[in-house]
Amino acid sequence: MNDFILKGEFEGRNMKKIILSAIVACAAFGAGMNYTDVVKDVYADANSAKSIGRLLPTNAVEILQTSGDRAQIKVKGYQNPAVSNVVYFADGARIISVAFAKTAPFDIKVIKEGKNGKWNEVETTVFVQKDGFSTDVNAMFAKADKMYKESCGVCHALPQTTHFNANQWPSLLKSMIGRTAIEKKDEWLVIEYLQKHSSDVNLGK
């Protein structure tokens, strides 16, 4: 019984931690921020032809400067100490903002060290193709919501986005996406939408 109570208290604290970090992340969803609705390759500099990772859809970026067809961007988020090559959207939730190849020369700076189980607050600066950005993330969420409802409610009752937590949604969607009309290029747009409107994050509330 004591173990059950302790487990419940831990899960409650973890839920609060994710919600609080999501609120902080939501603050980035404001003026001056840009978003993409597709996966973008990221590069170490303005001229490199070799990608070092990927920027995933609907994550806020600050465009620092442009050079030719490239833009230098800054992305802020959280770093799980056990996964050094990924910047996550929220503390404790595996919502990927930027994922670097493990062998790539990436640079993730720690802004604030996490304590008592919290993840580090971090930022990274990379280059991407400058096209395809928009300040209207809600339009991207609406597009993803439409695809989810039209494609995933055909064979069975459509689960509410809040029926699962952020960490559960990627594998759940991937298990059924082959039976839907969702195109490969839109897969991560829908996943990020579901994660950011899940039971423990839910930007839509």
Spans of features found by a protein language model:
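Short, Lys/Arg-enriched N-terminal segments with co-localized hydrophobic residues
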Residues: D3-N14
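Sec-dependent N-terminal signal peptides
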Residues: I18-A27
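Beta-loop motif signature
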Residues: M33-I63, S67-G68, G132-S134
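SH3/SH3-like beta-barrel superfamily modules
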Residues: R54-F127
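Electrostatic cytochrome c docking/interface patches
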Residues: E121-D145
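The canonical Cys-X-X-Cys-His
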Residues: Y148-P159, V190
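Gly/Gly-Pro-rich "capping" loops immediately C-terminal to redox-active cysteine motifs
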Residues: A157-T180
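C-terminal capping alpha-helices of c-type cytochrome domains
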Residues: T180-K205
